[in-house]
Each structure stands twice: as structure tokens, then as C-alpha cells.
Amino acid sequence: YRNGRFVSISKEKIPVEREDLENTFLWISEFTLEKEDRIIFFSDGVSQSGMGTAKMPFGWEDGAKEYIANLVNQYNDISAKELAHKIVNQAEKNDGYSLKDDTSCCVIYMRKPRNLLVCTGPPYDEKNDKYLANRVREFQGKKILCGGTTATIISRELGAKMEVDMNIVDKELPPISKMEGVDLVTEGILTLGKVERILTEGDIDRRREAGPAELMVRMLLNSDKITLLVGTRINTAHQDPNLPVELEIRRNVVKKIKFLLETKYLKDVEIMYI
């Protein structure tokens, strides 16, 4: 799918020798992909969905192409994952929410990598507060601030107003905040801990919750290159002898999140300590 339309691609028929089947062959195509191209392929459980109904006596057929075109034209940055899910869900709907055949769909989307910056914890040296703020301001991509002190530093250095958003709640976590120029502002170590648990459990799409941790996980999984900027200052205002332990907990949780994102979700992740 390219520039708002489906592109015809030449195919070559190649015979394949198999002992269990006669007259077996493959169709081979070669082509050069361009930025924003999408390759979409699916099983006949999709193309034949709805077969025998009054609306689709012969199945979905070309209606699937029309459905895909409408979706992509309306949401031109729709992810490969979301597009594949929507196609399969519509096929299930065509079959009266009871699929008649195995139904699979795969989408490949050629696009620029999506970058995400996650900042958690204040810099070790207060002189680096300005450096942290500049990193946030100049970063080309989505931005998450994880921790009240971190958010306060960015708000102060960039002159950005911050306000609590009570529309998104989680009984386990403090609410998120809103800040101009930042996509998500959350509490720190508790939120990171829940993010790690969700990534470990997997299957985020089946979770009904929509709290701070779930929002953060979805942003992580919708990104390709993720930078975790971890501050190493101990907040002396708390006067808590356990704070060095808390700092180590934050480091360990961030390392676990990095490991999960790289090994389980195939993300490109970098940790930077400041």
C-alpha cells in the first residue's frame, strides 16, 4: 500500500518439489520498498470472512482492501500492530463474532524509527539540571518524565507549567500530571516497578486498566529506540537513611526494564546515568 492506493506487483511462479504433494509452486515477487510503504498479507480466514451472509455472499474479498485503505487514509500513522488487529477484528465481526476459519494477518510498515526519552531521577550534580532540561527540550520524539523531583526540575528550568490530571487514575499509583512539551509525567519508583511487572507479564492489549503504568508501557512498546536517562542524586530533603537503597532499587528496575524491552520486545534501548 503506497501513497493512498494498492500497488500491483509482478509475480513469478516457481515450482516446488514435495513428496507429499504434486504440482506445488510458490509465487515470488521482488520489489523496492519506499518510506511509508505497507505490506499487508493475511490468510483466507480474512478474505473469506462473512461468506454466505446476505451482505457478503462470496466473502469479504475486495471489501478488505477498501477497509484497509479507509483506515490508513484516515489514520496515516497507524502502527503495523494496530492495523493487523483491526483487520482481524473486522473479519471476526464479518463472521458474526465466531470465526469460521483460522484467521491471521501480518503488516510490515516502512517508516522512520520512533524515538522515546524516559527521564527518571534528578542529576547527581545540581549543575546538570540545565543539561537534563536541554535534553528534554531538544529531544526529537516522545518524552516521559518519571518522578516528582524530575518533573519539578524540568518545569523550573523550562518554565513549563505542570498540573495534576485526575482523569487517569490507578489506586496503586499517584495520578499523572500534564506539562507542555512532555507527553507523560508520572510518579517515580512505584510506577517504574509496575511497568516492569506489566512488561514481564506481557499481553498489554488484554489489560483493561488505563493507569499511569499502562500508559507508559504502551508508549514504550510503540517506540523503536528508547533512551533511559537516569539521575543519581539522593534527595536529601527527605532525610531518609534508606534513600541510597531506593537509588539502587531504581537502577535495578531500570536495568530490568531495559532487559525486557530488548529481549522480549526487540527494542533498541540505551541507559545513560547523570
Model-found features: residue ranges?
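Conserved subregion of the PPM/PP2C metallophosphatase catalytic domain
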Residues: 1-267, 273
